[in-house]
């Protein structure tokens, strides 16, 4: 919740804050404190940079015929991480490729899996299984 509410991949023009409640790890007692969007950004910065490195590695291994499609159509972000503000802009900046956040990113994977199940025959060539698809 905090990651989505305050998280950002790039510094914001105006820092935002929120009150969080939890347990103090030193005393074990309940504690309330303020946390800023900049603190959250710094906390998630390293994992985000690792994700970008993996994206770059995948792009380097992409066959040329697919690379042109990616350059033309861009990268589409799905899932909860896609809700982190400016993640699309940072990935685009680091890769030089347009990046878009899909409509309803939290449901996109489920919708895509559902569409795949509707026509398994078309996907036989790219699916792997320990059993033969009938």
Where are these regions (language model features)?
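Residue-level signature of catalytic and energy-coupling elements of molecular machines
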Residues: 2, 55, 77, 113
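Glycine-rich phosphate-binding loops at beta-strand->alpha-helix junctions
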Residues: 68-91
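A glycine-rich phosphate-binding loop feature that marks nucleotide/adenosyl-phosphate handling sites
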Residues: 1-5, 74, 131-134
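Phosphate-binding glycine-rich/basic clefts of nucleotide- and phosphate-handling proteins
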Residues: 1-45
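Phosphate/ATP-binding catalytic cores across multiple sugar-kinase/actin-like superfamilies
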Residues: 43-70, 116-119
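Active-site lining segments that contact anionic ligands and/or coordinate catalytic metals
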Residues: 15, 30, 72-73, 96
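Conserved phosphate-binding/catalytic loops in two-lobed NTP-binding clefts
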Residues: 89-115, 123, 130
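Tubulin/FtsZ superfamily GTPase core signature
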Residues: 39, 56-59, 99, 103-104
């Amino acid at each position: 919740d905090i990651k989505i509410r305050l998280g950002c991949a790039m510094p914001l023009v105006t820092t935002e804050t929120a009150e969080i409640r939890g347990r103090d790890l030193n005393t074990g007692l309940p504690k309330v404190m303020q946390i800023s969007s900049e603190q959250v950004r710094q906390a998630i910065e390293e994992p985000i940079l690792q994700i970008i490195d993996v994206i770059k590695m995948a792009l380097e291994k992409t066959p040329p015929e697919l690379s042109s499609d990616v350059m033309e159509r861009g990268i589409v972000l799905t899932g909860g991480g896609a809700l982190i503000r400016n993640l699309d802009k940072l990935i685009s900046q680091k890769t030089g490729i347009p990046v878009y956040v899909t409509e309803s990113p939290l449901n996109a994977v489920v919708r895509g899996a559902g569409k795949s199940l509707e026509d398994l025959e078309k996907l036989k060539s790219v699916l792997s299984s320990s059993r033969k698809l009938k």
